[in-house]
Amino acid sequence: MKFLEKFGFEKKDIDALKENSTSALIKELEAHKKLVSKNLEYLNDMGVTNLIEIFVHYHDMFLMDNSNFVEIFNKYDQKDLVSKLAKNVQIMEYL
């Protein structure tokens, strides 16, 4: 899970994620780290400032095919979406 460090995750964030997730999920994230990184990169490039919080709560979304992942977020005005995500990550459930 060291690959998450380039997105601002600290060791404590990664340790907490490991403690609160199944070993199967951790293996899945590791096995698909290129895909997960690509999806994290997309949100980072969009200007999302709370990547860690979003990832911790909705990590399963980051295993989604990148084109589908991008399509979900492209339905909305990016500035507006970034602002709303900063205020309330729970809107991820409705995207």
Where are these regions (language model features)?
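Long amphipathic alpha-helical repeat/alpha-solenoid cores
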Residues: 1-95
